[in-house]
């Protein structure tokens, strides 16, 4: 306490000098105090409120009349209680302004009657604000309750109020000069007492109307108390008059922020930002960086209750912190935490952050308090965002939580649908899997009764196929696969009476049927139109993919008959090992070989020996031996597709189409005039126009020019 008071007295040199000048008028002050007590006793008969407040003042004055040393402790304790009363008295500020107007008018009428009317002002002010008068009465009574020995205590308490005056002088210097020249001659000793009270709690002024009436009161008291103006402190009265004028004129004053609380929230934020700048300057001048951070938490109690500006709470908290020491800040922290938890309002917290962003020293404390408020709000209510900065994040987090709460509601539906679909599939699978996978497993394990027969001649008949398989066993059914137009697709299915007969018929794979080596494979029993899917498992693909023991041979004499070529290849490669299959594709237009062959071996050893015969001589021709690949099989399949494309064109054209669909031997087919139809899908003329027009659109115009 002593150190802080000394520092404040040294720094505020002008105000300390003015205080020393005012010491000579202490005796007059005590006389004024007696008059105040008389005036209070007279005013008790007017209103009920006027009776209650003077009784409190007398009780406090009785407590303060012991020796000067006790005055310090009592004032510090009362100031600490005042800081608590300020928190409780804040909700009453908006109710009191109208009631304060009537006593103010009475004061102006009484002040013009006699010289001691200005002494009634400190007693009437508490009538308008009973809960707020504690700080003002304590400051005045502590000054008036002691003699010359009390002058040692005055610099301790008065510098709390003058600390704010240098800021007002620095911020609004021009206005001070004008107000000094106008009001320096019109100050009185009673006004100095009143000014000490006002500066001790300048933020308690309720409205602009009351302030204007107080200025009128000061004018009336100035005109009536010219005889007592010699005892005034010349520096305090101009400052008070300046503050009163600034409260009605500028937005930087402390009382103006109270009037703006009644006006609009936007003006509060602007004025609180300006006042917070001036407060931060005063805090830096007071050389107490630790205390301003603690009182900075006071706006939480006031803003959450009423949304007042930050400047008011900082002024009152700075004064109470300098007077009461370390005890009020602890109580303030408790008040701030309790008020923050009980009354969290999003608007007030938004105003707090708008003012906190403009003062650097208050950021750390306010942010920490905001975080506490946020945590408690989210735990208690979880309804509104705490501040502007966290509003977007809170909204996004709430949206995310909503999305997450929606997703669990949606995903079970998806899971239920998936389960229902799965149940449908599981319900349908047994009926479908009975002919599918179990049949295939049975076909592979126990053997199927049906064989897939591929590479059939297009002019083959069912009787011919039946005779071909008579040696294997009894044929129950023969099904040829056809296109939609009824044309034969070149393969079919043969069903035997027993699985043993079907297995025995597999041995006929590669044998010629009407000049073509027949492809045989166990088929899945699906019905008449299974060859489309059975084609994937057809014999001419399967050996090259499944066994991997197939070689591709070319370079032999193609002028020989198919049977002669087969026999010569079997003799040539017979020394390599067991040959399981020999396939020699042929041109179905002429019946001659296409110049290539495929040969399957039983094991990999035989296959490796067959590779060694690459480049060997067979009938004067050098053989080319290589591993069979899917591409040649696709070529053969392409031959089938060529036939399909052209078969749609009409009669007899399927051979030409297949010839054209092969490896380029189809010039004869095109020479017949309808071989180009394999590239189209409908007849002679239209496919010809498409084939001539699509590759070269320019030739079309050229033909038109020639015509």
UniProtKB/Swiss-Prot annotation:
Single Gene Ontology BP annotation: eukaryotic translation initiation factor 4F complex assembly
Compositionally biased spans, kind Polar residues: 420-429
Amino acid composition bias (Basic and acidic residues), ranges on this chain: 30-40, 47-60, 300-311, 407-417, 657-681
GO cellular component: nucleolus
Source species: Oryza sativa subsp. japonica (Rice)
PROSITE patterns: RRM
Protein name: Nucleolin 2
Compositional bias (Acidic residues): 75-85, 108-120, 144-153, 219-232, 248-263, 271-287, 312-326, 355-370, 395-406
Keywords noted in UniProt: Nucleus, Repeat, RNA-binding, rRNA processing
Residue stretches in coiled coil: none
Matches recorded under Pfam families: RRM_1 (PF00076)
């Amino acid at each position: 306490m002593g150190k802080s008071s000394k520092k404040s007295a040294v720094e505020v040199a002008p105000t300390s000098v003015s205080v020393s000048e005012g010491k000579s008028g202490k005796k007059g002050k005590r006389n004024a105090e007696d008059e105040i007590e008389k005036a209070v006793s007279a005013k008790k008969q007017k209103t009920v409120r006027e009776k209650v407040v003077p009784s409190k003042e007398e009780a406090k004055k009785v407590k303060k009349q012991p020796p000067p040393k006790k005055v310090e402790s009592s004032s510090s304790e009362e100031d600490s209680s005042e800081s608590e009363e300020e928190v409780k008295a804040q909700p009453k500020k908006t109710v009191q302004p109208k009631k304060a107007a009537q006593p103010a008018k009475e004061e102006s009428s009484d002040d013009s009657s006699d010289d001691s009317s200005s002494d009634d002002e400190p007693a009437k002010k508490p009538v308008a604000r009973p809960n707020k008068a504690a700080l003002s009465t304590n400051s005045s009574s502590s000054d008036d309750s002691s003699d010359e020995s009390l002058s040692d205590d005055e610099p301790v308490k008065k510098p709390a109020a003058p600390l704010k005056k240098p800021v007002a002088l620095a911020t609004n210097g021009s206005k001070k000069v004008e107000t000094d020249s106008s009001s320096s001659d019109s100050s009185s000793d009673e006004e100095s007492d009143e000014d000490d009270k006002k500066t001790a709690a300048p933020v308690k002024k309720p409205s602009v109307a009351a302030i204007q009436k107080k200025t009128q009161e000061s004018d009336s008291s100035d005109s009536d108390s010219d005889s007592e103006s010699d005892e005034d402190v010349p520096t305090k009265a101009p400052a008070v008059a300046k503050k009163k004028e600034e409260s009605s004129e500028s937005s930087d004053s402390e009382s103006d922020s109270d009037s703006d609380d009644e006006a609009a929230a936007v003006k509060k934020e602007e004025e609180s930002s300006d006042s917070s700048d001036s407060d931060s300057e005063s805090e830096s001048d007071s050389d107490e960086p630790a205390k301003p951070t603690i009182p900075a938490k006071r706006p939480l109690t006031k803003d959450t209750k009423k949304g007042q500006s930050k400047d008011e709470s900082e002024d009152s908290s700075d004064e109470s912190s300098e007077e009461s020491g370390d005890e009020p800040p602890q109580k303030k922290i408790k008040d701030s935490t309790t008020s923050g938890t009980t009354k969290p309002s999003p608007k007030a917290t938004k105003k707090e952050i708008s003012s906190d962003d403009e003062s650097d020293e208050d950021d750390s404390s306010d942010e920490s308090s905001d975080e506490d408020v946020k945590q408690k709000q989210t735990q208690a209510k979880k309804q509104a965002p705490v501040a502007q900065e966290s509003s977007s994040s809170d909204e996004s987090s709430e949206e995310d939580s909503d999305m997450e709460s929606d997703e669990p509601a949606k995903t079970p539906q998806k899971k239920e649908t998936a389960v229902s679909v799965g149940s449908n599939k599981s319900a349908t699978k047994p009926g479908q899997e009975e002919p599918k996978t179990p049949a295939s497993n049975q076909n592979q394990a126990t053997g199927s009764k049906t064989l897939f027969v591929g590479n059939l001649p297009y002019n083959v008949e069912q009787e011919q196929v039946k005779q071909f398989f008579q040696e294997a066993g009894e044929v129950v059914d023969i099904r040829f696969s056809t296109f939609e137009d009824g044309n034969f697709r070149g393969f079919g299915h043969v069903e035997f009476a027993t699985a043993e007969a079907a297995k025995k018929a597999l041995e006929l794979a590669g044998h010629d049927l009407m000049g073509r080596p027949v492809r045989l494979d166990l088929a899945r029993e699906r019905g008449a139109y299974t060859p489309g899917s059975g084609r994937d498992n057809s014999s001419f693909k399967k050996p090259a993919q499944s066994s991997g023991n197939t070689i591709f041979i070319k370079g032999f004499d193609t002028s020989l008959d198919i049977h002669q070529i087969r026999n010569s290849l079997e003799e040539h490669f017979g020394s390599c090992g067991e040959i399981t299959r020999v396939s020699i594709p042929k041109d179905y237009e002429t019946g001659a070989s296409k110049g290539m062959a495929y040969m399957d071996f039983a094991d990999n050893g035989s296959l490796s020996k067959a590779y060694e015969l690459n480049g060997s001589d067979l009938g004067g021709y050098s053989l080319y031996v290589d591993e069979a690949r899917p591409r040649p099989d696709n070529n053969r399949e392409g031959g089938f597709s060529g036939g399909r494309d052209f078969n749609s064109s009409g009669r007899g054209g399927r051979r030409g189409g297949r010839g054209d669909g092969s490896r380029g031997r189809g010039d004869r087919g095109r020479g017949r005039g309808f071989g180009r139809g394999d590239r189209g899908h409908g007849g002679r003329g239209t496919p010809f126009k498409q084939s001539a027009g699509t590759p070269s659109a320019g030739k079309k115009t050229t033909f038109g020019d020639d015509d």
